């Protein structure tokens, strides 16, 4: 199984913890919209004249030295965000606004929840907030990516705002008001790693980010070793709103299946993101497992009793599953996204008897980064 390549930025953060990951192809977009046409800033790893490993930005300038990758951020600091914008932060941010669920979850994982003074709308629909940072539910809302409250955000006078790529214009407007705003775009594993590195550098939490990277890489390596000789069952992953919508090979969810020791039956679909298919196509694929997205609008029972799937191997054998979403959606590029592969590996390979160990790993993650165990839910 190919490993997901850890980006140079995240390697710099985590090298002091002696991380090692095998190279491989990176997943592409994990959302329902195409990936941005403007690429994130690129970095590369090399060595200076003394043999010290360094990370260079796209201009060939030193971004960070590996041995200091988890050292405190020195301010003022100028960073290039995932929209290619240069953002200067004069002093360590004491107050933050996050206009995006994934960046809010990341802030919690980095220990920044008490610095948040405003977050995205519909916080009460995020179980992980109530468990790990219930105070977030009382914070002012700054709206959504479709209806962002620029005036309300500015009124909070935050030291730093973190927004998704869709709100790049809002980030520019905030900058004109003298409020630094970072744009993040964690739509696949590599971009998620870059987003973690970016936010960590901006908020002086690089040591915590290295700890998060360490956990992720250890689980990638563990799954690779465990599943090296395992047969790969064919998996159909059904989308949130429509069973006949599936994740093609260019999506984050496809890499999740691969890491879990499965084969995405739709992996050859690369010219789209959530792709519409027919029942006939599913029957032709005849998957061993059907996996429903964590936020699916339909149930496992709906699929099991669907007459259009009569004769499908997964249905006949009772191998229709739904990705858990009790804490957050593991089939999306959140800080705990690796847990989707951890959980799915046990479901696809019951003969390995790793469910108990997997649950220990899941509990360890949430206890370490969010302050609760998954079994408490």
Walk through the language-model features, giving the residues of each.
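Bacterial Sec-exported substrate-binding components of ABC uptake systems
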Residues: 5-6, 11, 22-105, 207-237, ...
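C-terminal motif of bacterial Sec signal peptides marking the signal peptidase cleavage site
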Residues: 17-21
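Short helix-initiation/N-cap motifs at beta->coil->alpha
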Residues: 82-84, 139-151, 270-279
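Extracytoplasmic substrate-binding proteins
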Residues: 86-88, 169-245, 266-268, 319-377
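A short, structured surface patch at a secondary-structure boundary
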Residues: 98-156, 160-162, 166, 265
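Short helices/loops that flank or line small-molecule/ion binding pockets
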Residues: 149-158, 176-177, 276-286
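Alpha-helical, coiled-coil/dimerization segments enriched in small aliphatic residues
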Residues: 246-274, 278
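Ligand-binding pocket segment of bilobal, Venus flytrap-like solute-binding proteins
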Residues: 256, 274-295
